[in-house]
Design a protein with these regions (language model features):
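Extracytoplasmic metal-acquisition and chelation regions
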Residues: 20-315
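Bacterial N-terminal signal peptides
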Residues: 7-19
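Positively charged n-region of N-terminal signal peptides that target proteins for export
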Residues: 1-4
């Protein structure tokens, strides 16, 4: 009797053990991708799909030139398979220190897991020489290239190439998703260019606060005639402001465009004195909760600019 009970107990134990055995999961763990900006993160998600888990260090409402380096950033970088930066010196004040502190050789410059998203972009405004008198000028050219939506394609290709380097087994997927993104982006760019003409933006003159909008202006046939900042990062003097107001009163300026992370008080005064509409524009994905994709960013830009142009035409 005791022998029977022992056998029964063993059978129950073995059965319970076997019932918990499951086949090994075949789904790969998503690659950890860390980007410096939300725009790069959005495009990385387009290319990587569910094979990536993407984190941006800079929030969409922050100035990407100046980001407080948090210890948590180093933890994220320590575990990253891929690091993607805007490059062209945009993050020079904060990203190199984080990369070195993270102690992850896989994502250092020159390693397979490092991506300079500008590597396939035709960069503009590269200075022939650099001096302190020029302010915070970027010696490697204007880094705000993502604000020409056509540049989303070379950005995506640079990210695709980086993903393939660190995960060659997913090359076919990354290639397909990149091609799909480029196709959809091409259709959207055509739509936005037509929209720029329809709302009367193309061919107009504008003043901007910072040199963030050079690529956007080139993409949509705008002429930037002056800046609130006389030089990048240098606050305007009273004389510069007065000269700017005089220039803007000539009546041929369509808009005063300003990035959403600068103090709006001076641009508001200039707009009041000149009658030129001030538009405060997002420069990045996730500038607010409704701008979730790269496509959303440009849809928002045109949705903000269109009524400002109408108000300017009435005044």
């Amino acid at each position: 009797m005791n022998r029977s009970l022992i056998c029964l107990a063993l059978a129950i134990t073995v059965g319970a053990t076997l019932s918990h055995i499951r086949p090994a999961h075949t789904e790969p763990k998503p690659l950890s991708v860390v980007t410096t900006t939300e725009d790069l993160a959005a495009i990385a998600r387009e290319v990587g799909g569910d094979r990536v888990r993407v984190t941006s260090l800079c929030r969409g409402y922050q100035d990407p030139h100046f980001v407080d380096a948090k210890p948590s950033f180093m933890v994220q970088l320590k575990n990253a398979a891929l690091f993607v930066e805007v490059g062209r010196g945009l993050e020079v004040g904060w990203a190199p220190g984080l990369l070195n502190g993270a102690r992850n050789p896989r994502i250092l410059p020159g390693a397979p897991g490092f991506v300079d998203a500008s590597s396939q972009v035709q960069v503009i405004e590269v200075p022939s020489s650099v001096s302190r008198a020029q302010g915070d000028v970027h010696p490697f050219g204007n880094p705000h290239y993502w604000l020409d939506p056509a540049n989303g394609a070379p950005i995506a290709r640079a990210i695709r190439d980086g993903l393939i380097r660190v995960s060659p087994g997913n090359a076919a997927l990354f290639n397909q998703r990149c091609a799909d993104f480029e196709q959809r982006l091409g259709v959207a760019v055509t739509r936005w260019k037509q929209q720029a003409k329809t709302i009367g933006l193309s061919g107009r003159k504008v003043v901007t606060y910072h040199r963030s909008w050079s690529y956007f202006a080139r993409a949509f046939d705008l002429t930037v005639v002056d800046y609130v900042e006389p030089r990048p990062g240098i606050p305007p003097s009273p004389n510069h402001v007065q000269d700017l107001v005089t220039r803007m009163k000539q009546g041929d300026i369509a808009l005063l465009a300003m990035e959403d992370f600068f103090d709006p008080r001076l641009p508001q005064k200039i707009a009041q004195q000149t009658g030129v509409p001030l538009v405060i524009l997002p420069t990045s994905v996730a500038a607010d909760e409704k701008i979730k994709t790269y496509f959303d960013l440009f849809d928002r830009l045109f949705a903000t600019i269109a009524p400002a142009l109408k108000s300017g035409a009435k005044s």
